[in-house]
């Protein structure tokens, strides 16, 4: 399996996003999106997935963080798809349950090339919460947008379920950590499947 790296540059009237990743890294990251809490979540995603990430986003945060958050996830998903290539030799499936104090999240990932997202279990008010200190806040509803944008651009099937949780920060962080750990397993090389695509179809990109 060759070293799996990718670089994506994406520019629109709403944002400019530059993403570089290394799937076989050590979870090192340099993240700047203009939304502090989102930087924290992406740093967490990098650390616990083992994917090195360098992400720089500038956007119309004077409106709010929505465009910058979503567009960053789109570019990150595109980078994942590029780095995974034909997916030869990967494990393909990953499943993780991660706690953060009172919060508990489960994420199941299939790197199948068939995008799908199912999110459930969050408290009713989570979508309306704004998280962050000074500067641009992160609205709780953006977690679904991130998962959807990431999955549909990377070709992932993602099932994310909050099993318990009260604090909005803890809920988001448990969810991102669960995604990270599930991804770490799914993209890892499977020595028993070296050089082969883990599918009876013989391909995961069609």
Swiss-Prot record:
Molecular function, one GO term: imidazoleglycerol-phosphate dehydratase activity
Pathway(s) of this molecule: Amino-acid biosynthesis; L-histidine biosynthesis; L-histidine from 5-phospho-alpha-D-ribose 1-diphosphate: step 6/9
Primary location recorded for the protein, binned into one broad class: cytoplasm
Top enzyme category: lyase
Its EC number(s): 4.2.1.19
Matching CDD domains: IGPD
A GO CC term attached to the entry: cytoplasm
Signal peptide: none
Catalytic activity: D-erythro-1-(imidazol-4-yl)glycerol 3-phosphate = 3-(imidazol-4-yl)-2-oxopropyl phosphate + H2O
Keyword Lyase: yes
Pfam families in alphabetical order: IGPD (PF00475)
Top-rank taxon, per record: Bacteria
The entry's keywords: Amino-acid biosynthesis, Cytoplasm, Histidine biosynthesis, Lyase
Biological processes per GO annotation: L-histidine biosynthetic process
Cell location: Cytoplasm
Keyword S-adenosyl-L-methionine attached: no
PANTHER family: IMIDAZOLEGLYCEROL-PHOSPHATE DEHYDRATASE (PTHR23133:SF2), IMIDAZOLEGLYCEROL-PHOSPHATE DEHYDRATASE HIS7 (PTHR23133)
Family to which the UniProt record says this protein belongs: Belongs to the imidazoleglycerol-phosphate dehydratase family.
Protein name, per record: Imidazoleglycerol-phosphate dehydratase
Originating organism: Cutibacterium acnes (strain DSM 16379 / KPA171202) (Propionibacterium acnes)
Gene: hisB
């Amino acid at each position: 399996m060759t070293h799996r790296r990718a670089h994506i540059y994406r520019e629109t009237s709403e944002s400019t996003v530059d993403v570089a990743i290394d799937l076989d890294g050590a979870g090192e990251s340099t993240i700047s999106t203009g939304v502090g809490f989102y930087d924290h979540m992406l740093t967490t995603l990098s650390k616990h997935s083992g994917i090195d990430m360098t992400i720089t986003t500038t956007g119309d945060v004077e409106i709010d963080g929505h465009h910058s958050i979503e567009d960053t996830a789109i570019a990150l998903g595109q980078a994942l798809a590029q780095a995974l290539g034909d997916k030869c030799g990967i494990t393909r499936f990953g499943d993780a349950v991660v706690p953060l104090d009172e919060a508990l999240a489960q994420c199941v990932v299939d790197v199948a090339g068939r995008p799908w997202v199912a999110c459930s279990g969050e408290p009713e008010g989570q979508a309306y919460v704004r998280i962050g200190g000074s500067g641009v806040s992160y609205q709780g509803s953006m977690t679904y947008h991130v998962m959807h944008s990431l999955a549909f651009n990377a070709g992932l099937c993602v099932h994310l379920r909050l099993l318990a949780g009260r604090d909005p920060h803890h809920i988001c962080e448990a969810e991102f950590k669960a995604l990270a750990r599930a991804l770490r397993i799914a993209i890892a090389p499977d020595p028993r499947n070296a050089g082969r695509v883990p599918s009876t179809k013989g391909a995961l990109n069609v």
